[in-house]
Structure formats: C-alpha cells, structure tokens
Amino acid sequence: MKSRKSGFTLVELLTVLVIIALMMGVLLPALNLVRNTAKKAKQEVQFATIEQAIMAFKGDYGDYPPSNNLYGDYEGAQQLAEALVGWDLMGFDTDSAWRSNGCLDAAGINWIYPPQPLDLTDPVVKKNLEDRKGPYLELSKANVFRLGNTVNGPGLFNNTGALNPDRYVLCDSFGAKNLILKNGTKTETVIAGTPILYYKANTSSKQWGPPGSVNKRIYFDGDNRALVSLGRMTDGKPHPLGGITDPFPSMGFPANFYYYLIDQKMVPIMGQYGWPVNADSYVLISAGADGLYGTADDITNF
C-alpha cells in the first residue's frame, strides 16, 4: 500500500490564497476608514487649538489676522502662520506690515523682524524679541512648514509661483509629503500635511452675491488664490475650490469658492446666493485626506 504524501495540494493552496485576498479586500478599506476617521478627529482638535490661538491673538492685536494679498506674494495662509507663530517662528511683532520680507517697505530697508540669522548679542534684536507676542501655538505641535524649497531649507512645493517660498504656513493633519530636515550632520524625516487655508471676513461689507466687485464681498477668493492655483501638493491636480463649474457662475471667478461658503439656511432669507458662513469672523479649510480643497472630505470650522 502506498503511503499518502503530506502537504497541501495546488488547489488547496489556491483556495487559501483566494480567501486571504478576499479578507484583505474587506479589511484594507476598513483599515483606511479607521485611519482617516482618526486623522479627521485629529484635524478637528487642531482646528480647535488654532481657534483658541486666534482668539488669544485677537486679544493682543485687537482684530483677527488679515488674509489679503496686497503685495502679490503673501496670502492668508501665510499671514495666519505669521500671526500665530511669527514671521521667523519667534513670535509676532505687533508692528508688522504683513509683508513677506518682514519689513516696512518692499525694498527691505526698514525691518520689523530682524535679518536672519538673529544676532542675539545685538541689544536692538534682543529688545525686538522681548516685545513680541506669542507664539500662540506650541511650535513643536503647530505643523508649520516653509511653503517652498529654498536654500534655507525644504518646503512643500518646488515652485510657489508668485508667493514667497520662504514664508511659513500651518499644515493639516493629513500627511501628504515627506520632508527631510537637516541639523548639522543629523537628518530627520517629517510628514507634512496640506496648507490650511485662512480667510478673514470683511465685516464692513454687506455684499455677497452679484452684482458688484468680488473683492468687496464678505469673503474674497483672492485671499488664497495663488496658493490654490498651485494645485494639489503631491501631483499638481487642480483644486475644485478654484473652479468655475458652480451653478452660479455669475458670482465671479472662481464661482466654486463662493458656493462653497454659502450658508444654506440663509437661502430662503437672502435668495439663491444665500449668505456666507462665519460672516463676522473667519474660515479655516483643510483639504482632508484627498489633499484637494473643495471636495466632500474637507474639514472646516463651519
């Protein structure tokens, strides 16, 4: 009588592999859902922390941080970072002119924030630092990164267009890009999220829908238009928030931004264009897990 050989047959092995593949097909989406839910919760906590920091800033400064692009190279996301951690990450100077060069003038002659590297033996520099406010966020937990790659260090984008690449932004909790930070002979890899968009409401305006100039409305897309136009951080894919496919194209370019901020509860009162959310304060927008502004997974403060 022949002895039976031990082991699995090919059919049995294939069956096991099919079962494993099916289980992975079920488990992986579930794991991704759990992971994204955890990141969403973390992002909501970050927004709560930022909102507390903004209120502390307002208490010192008398107003919310601005979100304009008066000089073409410095927008709302960057101005929020200056307000909460400082132009040079060393706290906010209440004399700020909100320029990307940290000076009173475009030529960079009359500085508000001292030139870098900071000379701590200079009494003028020491006094400047002593008079600063904040930082209002703990720097190690602020998720703050340089906007672009420069000789001064790595950043989120290789090309920042018209925006000053050396200025900082606060990033969300959805890791999108690895950055290698160097400190002497040591290197550290950190995961940076997508920049958090910040828009301050124009509380003196009572204009939202057409007619009228878009930059006179309660919120103005131009406050972060250059940053949004860079596309998704990982591949440059256009952000839906910057599009014009909205049902109300007459609201002005980009119409999607204005539709995105409509408080639907106000439509029966104000008509089809409604009224914006947070009309007396500000808006924060995280691109969410997909890294795109203007999609269903965005996290906002409204």
Located regions from the model:
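Conserved aromatic-histidine-acidic binding/catalytic patches
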Residues: 15, 35-39, 72, 272
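N-terminal single-pass transmembrane signal-anchor helix
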Residues: 4-34, 43, 47
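Hydrophobic helical segment of the DHp/HisKA dimerization and phosphotransfer domain
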Residues: 31-34, 38, 54
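N-terminal pilin/flagellin-like segments and related low-complexity appendage regions
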Residues: 44-302
